A protein has these predicted regions:
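AlphaC helix of the protein kinase catalytic domain
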Residues: 77-86
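Conserved short submotifs of the Hanks-type protein kinase catalytic core
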Residues: 63-76
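Short beta-strand micro-motifs within the conserved protein kinase catalytic domain, predominantly
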Residues: 54-65
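Structural motif at the C-terminus of the N-lobe alphaC helix and the adjacent alphaC-beta4 loop
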Residues: 40-51, 102
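An alpha-helical support segment within catalytic cores of ATP-dependent transferases
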Residues: 104-150, 158-162, 166
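Internal "kinase-insert"/substrate-recognition segments embedded within catalytic cores
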Residues: 86-114
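Active-site Asp-x-Gly
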Residues: 164-188
Length: 188
């Protein structure tokens, strides 16, 4: 694999292009379990029929874990908004439509958002009474099963040359309440 062409640098990872492949190489101290979970999430989302890059392989490169997937030629919505501020409303509409499409799908094998939130509450630096109250409130909420991206932002939507939106970065994907996922998008 040729790792000469860097296309993105993010916390704990660098993304490269090698022809028609995209190679996300994680830092050497990045958890193997987290890499495999991200690849598994992406593979499971492929089965929903959403436009996403297909996982081709998971491997190690010079002792670092990597996910190899299809390269999607295009620009992120974030890039397009910066390059064409006069079209920002059009791009925001496409962004919202894409999130609604993602959230219209179900994927029963994804982890549950409620379980993830329960773990986060348990690990939070809160007194026992507050943790108990939060766990109780969370348990009392209705059960949902919609696909939740978990990090939906304009930099995670690539618009291909033919105008098709592709959603990337499925490391935080869960199934749960689509409104909670939309709220997270709005707050971030």
């Amino acid at each position: 694999m040729n790792l000469d062409r860097v296309i993105a640098v993010r916390t704990n990872k660098t993304v490269y292009r090698d022809g028609d492949k995209c190679i996300k190489v994680f830092d050497s101290d990045y958890s193997k379990a987290d890499v495999l979970n991200e690849a598994l999430n992406q593979a499971r989302i492929e089965e929903t029929g959403l436009n996403i890059p297909k996982v081709l392989e998971v491997c190690t490169i010079e002792g670092k874990w990597a996910i190899v997937s299809e390269y999607i030629k295009g620009k992120t919505l974030s890039q397009l908004m910066q390059e064409h501020p006069e079209k920002k409303d059009e791009y925001l509409r496409l962004f919202v439509e894409t999130q609604l499409l993602v959230q219209s799908k179900t994927c029963p094998l994804l982890s549950r958002l409620k379980d993830k939130m329960n773990r986060k509450i348990s690990q939070a630096d809160l007194d026992a009474t507050t943790r108990y109250d939060l766990h109780t409130r969370l348990e009392g909420m209705p059960k949902h099963n919609k696909v939740c991206h978990g990090d939906f932002r304009p930099s995670n939507v690539i618009i291909s040359e033919d105008g098709t939106p592709y959603v990337i970065d499925w490391s935080h994907a869960t199934q749960g309440n689509a409104s909670a996922d939309a709220a997270r998008t709005y707050l971030c």
